[in-house]
Structure formats: C-alpha cells, structure tokens
Amino acid sequence: MGKGFYISKPVGIVSIILCAGALATIIALSVVYSEEKAKNNNQVSPTDGGTTSKPPVTTLAPSNEPWDKYRLPKNLVPDHYNLTLWPRLTPDLTTGLYIFTGKSTVEFETTEETDLILIHSSKLNYTILENGHLARLTSVNSGVRVPLIKVSWLQSVTQYLVLQLDGKLMTGHRYHLYTKFTGELADDLGGFYRSEYMEDGVKKVVATTQMQPTDARKAFPCFDEPAMKAIFYITLIHDRGTVALSNGEEKGYPVTIDNQHVQKTVFEPTEKMSTYLLAFIVSDFDFINNTIDGVWIRIFARKPAIAAGQGEYALNKTGPILKFFEKYYNSSYPLPKSDQIALPDFNAGAMENWGLITYRETALLYDKEFSSNSNKQRIATIIAHELAHMWFGNLVTLRWWNDLWLNEGFASYVEYLGAHEAEPDWNVKDLIVLGDVHRVFAVDALASSHPLSSKEEDIQKPAQISELFDAISYSKGASVLRMLSDFLTEEVFTMGLRTYLSEFAFGNAVYTDLWKHLQMCLCTRISRTLRPTVNIIFPQMGFPVVTIDTKTGVVSQKHFLLDPDSEVTAPSPFNYEWIVPIKWMKTGAVQSPYWLRGKSATNDAMKALGTEWVLANLNVVGYYRVNYDEENWGRLLNGLSTNHQLIPVINRAQLVDDAFNLARAKIISTVLALNTTKYLDKEREYMPWESALNNLDFFYLMFDRSEVYGPMQDYLRKQVTPLFNYYKTLTENWSKVPDGHMDQYNQVNAISLACRTGLEELKPSALSVVMLSFFRIHPNLRSTVYCNAIAASGANEWEFAWSQFKNATIATEADKLRSALACTKQPWLLNRYLEYTLDPKMIRKQDATSTIVYIANNVIGQSLAWDFVRARWSYIFTQYGGGSFSFSNLINGVTKRFSTEFELQQLKQFKEDNAEVGFGSGTLAVDQSIERTTANIKWIAENKQNVLNWFRDETKPVF
C-alpha cells in the first residue's frame, strides 16, 4: 500500500473504537461480489456421444503385477505428445454434467523389450476404437511389426490404462499410442476442472487445470512422473469469444466441427518438461501486458478486475523479479512469454506451470483501496516464489517426489530475495525468520516429524506424495538453504546453483547433485568439504538445541523435542547429532564463527565474566535453538531491559521464541520465558513483538478457558499500552498509517492486542456518539475491526456482514469478511456457518477447510468445529479431494487447542474410526496432533499454577 493513502483524523479514531463493537463500519463497503458457483450433484460418469469404455478392473488383493505398483516401469520413455482437448463450458444435455473430450497421441521409445504398456489414467472414459480396445498402437519406425493389443483395461487403484500385447516392443524403437477419451470438467480443483463466477448477473465458467502432483492423468493419459519429461503439442477447441491459454504461445482461428462454430487454438510446442507443469485454460478473461527484454508478460483475470487495475501491481513487479532471477541464476528466462492468471477457484496459493502460472485471486490481484500491506507482500513473495521455479523446478526438475523439498524449499528461500528486489524498502528478507524458521521449528520439534529427503521407495502413492507438501519441505528447506548460503557465502552458493542448472537443464536431478556442484565451487575458494554437513542435515529429521555454558565455555547439543518424554522411533544414522555453524557475539561485539562438530566441546572464548553476555545464532541463520546457563540468561534479560537495541532486532525475536519453546520442552522454566516479555513495553520493532504474540497465542489456546485468562489479559494490556500510544502519536491520532513496512505491521499488532485485551480507550463508551458514522477503514485494519465488530454483535449484524461477503468483488476483501464471520460469539451462527462450508453455493470449495479452521480459532467455535469435522470426515475427505494439500492444515487447525485427556481420547478415536477412509495429506498431521495434545496436557499440569502466579504478580497495583 502506498504511503500517500490516508484517512481523516476523526474517521481514524472511530475506526479504532469500532474494533470493540460497531458493525456499522462495514456498511460503507458496498461492492458487488461474484455469486458462489452452483454445485452439480449429479454423480453420473461423463459420457460423449458414441463413447463407451470397459468397466474398471480393480485388484482387491496385493499382488506383484506391474499394474498393481504405483511407480511406472522404466522401459518406456515418452518423447512428445500431440494432445487436443475440447472443454464444454455448458452442461451436457444428456447427463447435465460439464465435460471435456480429447484425443492424444504419445510417441515413446522402448528402452527394454516388453509386452506391456502402462500409462497413467484417472477418471477418464475411453472410446472403444476400431480394434475393439481402448487405445491404438502403431510404429514410428517403418518395417517394424507392431504387436497387437490382446486386452486393455483401467486399473483404478493405481490409476493406469493397461495394454497387454501379443508380442514384444523392440528396444530402441519408437511407437505411437492413440486414445480418445471423455472426462468430467468437475469443480474438484484437480486435473482439468471447472471454476465459476458471476459477472453482471451472468454465470461464467472457466476451464482450468491443476496437475501437481499427480493429476495430469485426470486430463489425458500420460506417463505422469516428473522424470518422464516430454515435449507437448497442445491444441484447444473452445467457444468463439473465449480465450485459450497454455504453456506455449498461441495462434487461433475459427473452425466448424460437427456443425458447431468454434475456435481452434494451436500452441507452440513446449520445451521438454514434466507433466505436472502443464496447464491449459479457457475463459473470457481480459489481460494487461508488457514486454521486457523480449519476454512478453501478461496478467489475466476477470474483466472487472482488470478494468479496476487490480493486475497492475503484479505486472509492474513481475519484470524486475524476472530480471533478478536471470542475474541470480546467470541464465536467461528460457521461454518467450510469462503468463500469470488469477482464478476464482484454486486450491493452492499458486502453481508454477511453465509459462502459464496460475494463482488464487488473493495471490495476484491488488487493489489499493481494499488490499492490505500484508496482501501486497503476499503477492510480491508468491510471484517471486513461482518465478524462481521457472529455473529451479521447471528447467531442472526433481527426479522423484521424495526430493520435493529441493523444489519448494529453494523457492521458499529465494522468494524473499526476489521480493526484496521488487520492494527494497521493506527489509522483507528478515521476515524469513518469522515466516519460515520459527514456523517450521514447531513441527520439526515433534517426534513424528520427518526428514527433508525421504527414501524414494517410501514415497509411492499419491496420498504419500501430497503429505510432503508441508512445512518441512517448504520452510525447513528454505531455512537450511539459507544457512548453507550463509556459511558457504552467497557467492559460492550462487556459483554452485549456476553450474547445477547448466548441467541438468531440461533434465532431472536429486539433491546430492546440487551438493556436488556446491562442493566443487567451495573447493575453488577453500579446501573444505561440504559433504559431512549436508549428510547430517538432510537424512535425519529434527534439529538441535545448542547449550552454551558461559561459566565453563562448554558448548553442547541434543535433539530438541517439544515433548522430551516422547519416543523417537525413527532411527538416524547420525544418532541425532549435527555439525552446527555458530555465529555469535559477546556483549554486542561480533566474534569469530565457531563450529560444533560433536556432542560437546569447549570454547574458552565463550566464557563470560562480570556483566558480559553471550548471544549465539546471530540473525538466526543457523537451523537450531540456543540455550544458556541461568546466569547468562539473566544478563541477557538485563540487557533487554536496560539497552535492548544493543541486541540485533532479529535476535530479540529469537530470544523470545527460543525461551518459550525451551520452556515447553522443560529445558528452562516457564517463568524465565515469560520474563523475556517484560521489556516489551520499551520495544517498538515488529519482529520481537510478532515473535512474542505468536508464542503468547499458545497461552491463549491453553488458558482462555481457565482462571489464568483474566490476569493474562491484564498483563498484556499493560504491556501493549505504550506501543498503542506510540502508534497513536506516530500516525497523528490514527489519521494515517506509518510509512515503514514493518511499522504498518506492528501498528496492526498494537491495535489487535489492545482490542483483544480490552484497552479502555477502545471501549464503546469512549466515543459511542460517532460509532454510527459512515466511513472507510484502512485495509490494514479491516481484519481486526471486522472481527471485533462481529464478535460484539448479534445475528442481524452477522447477516449483514454475510451479504457483504457474498457481494464482494475484491477477493482480498471477501477473505477478510469470511474470516471475520467466524468471530461471532453466537454458537448457532457458528454451527450454521460450518454447514455453509460444505455447500459450494455458500463457500467456495477452495475456502472450505480454511473457513472451518477460522471457526476453530474462536474459543466458542473450537468444539463445534471439531465435532463437525469428526461427524463429516468421510464426506469432507471424499468430496473435497483425498489428495488435497489442505487436510493437514484442517486437522492441525481444529485440534491445536486440545489440552485435556478427554480431547486426547477423542483424537485417538477419530484416528481409529477413520482408518479405512484415510486422511490423505493429513495422515502425518493426525499423529502430530496426538503428540502435541499429549505434550499440552503435561505442560498445563506442570505450569498452570506458576503461570497464574506470575501474571498476578506482574499486575499487582504498585503503591
């Protein structure tokens, strides 16, 4: 958001007052939002005139047949596909379903003789061809006998089209496999699917795709593994007046097919690429464009969004970010165009399809009057994340999904670098500590965590692949790569990336290939080996806590576990020890780096005398937590109290986060952790405050139903008051927002916590006379104001907010309202809202699970949401996609407040009751929730009274 956007002084005051209860603030927001799409409940399989298929054959018992294995054999290698698809954007007259038809010819080479063809296929109906089978096989090589197809069938469990031949395919020969098929253009957000929206009272339909990780097979038969790269010749048939897009540049012309006047769009052949990076879209969207150094950049979205200028920010930032990565990789962008499109329905945040990146609307579209500072940062970082993939992931691709972290961890690291290039005044690179390092510590500290890199044979099924799209792959990957870049130096790190990309361009690699290149570049600088360090980091889960005893200089490490009583069953070849790079300072002076290479060692330089203090892991570049002897903790706390700016701002955030988590792990006392917050009345920086609030959220979750809640509120209200007054002065009594990016974030923290704790100035009685004023609320403050307003209101106000949500035309505004609707204190409204989540007419499928989590975040809604998920799990899982990445977030979200034996038993029963249904990508989250709940029960039993006493002592009146 630009710093020139202000609100008037009296309006600013009212906007703060209303966080205590005036829903009238929402009245000013009268905008038109697209109606929710109607769900087609007809479950009939899609058909097309004249097409039939043999019934699927499913093997009921385990077998060793190739078609019962989830991995393709290596004897067939695709070269290219000729694919024509025709999505129908109106329902089929016979079935009432939206369908697509297609035909495909794939050319492949035989690398080993075989009489069996396996090609992935899911939820497709095939036309029986003239040979009586589901496919036709011909030879590319002249004079070569082509075996006949003896039998063809669909193996639904492992998702294959199987062709048994009457003879062998010859090694070194090439063949064509032709199929004709029909699929449903469903609203399931996977494969080739349907998105809907309303425009000027008319329902519009978009045909779009999401292939990653294993849904290209839902769009056409293909060798659907990342190492099976090929060239794709794509043709789309579509209604005239609509626009067709795919990975390559397009050329369209009108044709007539079966007396239908349609458009035929032919795309330039792709580069050699993986199936999961394919995309094809048909819509009547509009676009804006620019050309930078010969690369055509286009931003597509709904016509009203483009007309309103919502694509301008993305267009303006894409070019600089793209140029940054060209320089960073020392490699030109390999395609002639870069299309980015905002979709009304999209399950992930964005997808890096090569040349056609797809986004949720909230991840690409920015409106200066409705989008907040955090919305803008999200757009910049997600664009950078996806553009980073154009080289790291697309040009060079993982060989198999067990190395997913190499794709996603790398993009999650350099997204901060790319966003910094786009917005250098933000200091966004520092935020990786809060957004990724601290985030993943919470997961990786569980005994049920998993290593960055799994064994290939352990990741076979689509659900197992989906499980890997988690905080470990994204955030731990980013954190560890940042650490490597730091101790190797950015120069060596980027040099290794460049040689790696050069060697494996248009091919596939494993993570050890990258280490080889980093090692080669390291050896050009110093004769030090990288292998021991990375070998220890990547095959074992978790991370260490490093303890420094400043009395003796002894530095030691152990595996950090949030619950020290939990049992680690996964063996480690390194016994959960790490080689730890330690950057540190003594009393404000930076010291020489130190490497801990064993369980413990002595470093005399780390002894502290008198008032000296030691602080390790400067700027949190290392992937570990730090503990100290009690005396050094005391000196650090004294330093925070007397001259906190002597400690780097990132490390002030680190001290708070480390202390609270060390206390949860019983390594230090909870009282010591709470003492790290006492200096906050002097703190004005965002990162320490955000770190404190993130950790105090755990206290809210554990104690907002107990007698601890009142004294805790009193203490936090006391601590936030100076920050609140600071921003009140800085913004001239709330007449504007601060200039700085971090200051804007911290202003929101100050207001949110002041509202949450009932600061007197924000109570309705203070300025009730102006509470009915009509005005606009700054986008940064809307989430806070809306939530507090709805929490203090009743059913009529909730209904009004619901109507504003349904009519919102700005995706970020709709998201704020959708979240705020979960803040009501009326149980019946929350129960009804839960029912809405499973009705796509009310809540889009992409938003269903996050809405349930919003409701669970409400102390009143938590038990309602949990009961709802338990009762509806089978329906949620089957109707909302067993491979959806969002199930882990759902399970973690509805169970994070669990802290009683009763809730633990319910959770275990939930796991047992739904074992047959399954949990898909949430499988690991169930075990993590059980482990987390067990730890919470113990922690409350051991700490509740001490915490209560501490808050009471800190809020006693001073006479």
Place the predicted regions along the sequence by residue.
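N-terminal, polar/Ser/Thr-rich
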Residues: G2-G102, D200-V206, P226
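Long, ordered, helix-rich scaffold segments
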Residues: V437-H438, A442, G477, D549, ...
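Extended, low-hydrophobicity, Ser/Thr/Pro/Gly-biased non-transmembrane segments
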Residues: K69-L76, H80, F100, E107, ...
